[in-house]
Swiss-Prot record:
GO terms for cellular component: membrane. It comes from Homo sapiens. This is Transmembrane protein 121. May play a role in MAPK signaling. Keywords: Membrane, Transmembrane, Transmembrane helix. Highly expressed in heart and detected in pancreas, liver and skeletal muscle. InterPro entries: CECR6/TMEM121 (IPR032776), TMEM121 (IPR042314). It comes from the Eukaryota. Residues 277-319 are annotated as: Disordered. Residues 277-306 have a biased composition (Pro residues). It is found in: Membrane. Belongs to the TMEM121 family. The chain crosses the membrane at residues 10-30, 43-63, 74-94, 112-132, 150-170, 174-194, 214-234. It is a multi-pass membrane protein.
Length: 319
């Protein structure tokens, strides 16, 4: 498959979000260390950023080239690479906060770190999907349905980031070490996998995308985010008396459970009541428009020098 020319605005915006968030994470890592250790950390993060930028230089261009197509393969690669590197840096920042090193007592810096992640991570996902660049999604209803499903993905990402932020925002932690590690790496795994599942559903549907048939991500997020997040927060409140539990996101997960249950029931009813050809009508491409201009009349050939006259019509003879 030959990709079209890359969208320069999309490439620049994606690179700006990725490298901007990486630069802020590097600033946190350097600021949390002091003395000769700071110089070593600065050298390490600079070398890592140069290597990451070399890889990003090619992957971001490929993502910008496929943004107007129905495929999102390079977008999944870029997302996996970004979250993999970002969460490694975030883990060391989290460990430095636990060790109460320099700058760890500043609550504003912790809140700013959470704000940075909550803007850049869901924002990059929506950039990689690039719904506004999908010119093959022509109907307004289908576009808004797809936008609503992508909004649920962004909410799940915010939910996972909130669970991670509850580990470093308070000055003291009430959870044991094993519970903190389990929470961090569970969210890390879901941040890697779940957006790639959503992007793969968009890519597998192709140009004749049907949002009502994209059921893999809702099932996975229902089990891994909505149910597990409610149980984990309830266990933290009941067992460890953790006051950092977000009641707002608990309510969000309860609403998501009810909404997705209704969606699954409606989908089963549609499959049962309508035959497969009726469901596949929406997948058919629109018929090509015919040219409304009538063809020109054929020329009348006659001897030169005489005007072209229409031959008189003859009445049929009655026999």
């Amino acid at each position: 498959m030959v990709l079209p020319p890359p969208d320069r605005r999309h490439v620049c915006l994606t690179t700006l979000v990725i490298m901007g968030s990486m630069a802020v994470m590097d600033a946190y890592l350097v600021e949390q260390n002091q003395g000769p250790r700071k110089i070593g950390v600065c050298i390490i993060v600079l070398v890592g950023d140069v290597c990451f930028l070399l890889v990003l230089r090619y992957v971001a261009v490929w993502v910008g080239a496929e943004v107007r197509t129905a495929k999102r393969g390079y977008a999944m690669i870029l997302w996996f690479l970004y979250i993999f590197v970002l969460e490694i840096k975030l883990y060391f920042i989290f460990q430095n906060y636990k060790a109460a090193r320099r700058g760890a007592a500043d609550p504003v810096a912790r809140k700013a770190l959470t704000l940075l992640l909550s803007v850049c991570v869901p924002g990059l996902f929506l950039l990689l999907v690039a719904l506004d660049r999908m010119e093959y999604v022509r109907t307004f209803r289908k576009r808004e349905d797809l936008r609503g499903r992508l909004f649920w993905v962004a909410l799940d990402l915010l939910d996972l980031l909130d669970m991670q932020a509850s580990l470093w925002e308070p000055p003291r932690s009430g959870l044991p070490l094993w519970a903190e590690g389990l929470t961090f790496f569970y969210c890390y795994m879901l941040l890697l996998v779940l957006p790639c599942v959503a992007l793969s559903e968009v890519s597998m549907q192709g140009e004749h995308i049907a949002p009502q048939k994209m059921m893999l991500y809702p099932v996975l997020s229902l089990a891994t985010v909505n149910v597990v997040a409610v149980l984990a927060r309830a266990a933290n409140m009941a067992l460890f008396r953790d006051s950092r539990v977000s009641a707002i996101f608990v309510g969000k997960n309860v609403v998501a459970l009810a909404t997705k249950a209704c969606t699954f029931l409606e989908y089963r009813r549609q499959v049962r009541d309508f035959p497969p050809p009726a469901l596949s009508l929406e997948l058919q491409p629109p018929p090509p428009q015919r040219n409304s201009v009538p063809p020109p009349p054929p020329p009348l050939h006659g001897p030169p020098g005489r005007p072209h006259m229409s031959s008189p019509t003859r009445d049929p003879l009655d026999t």
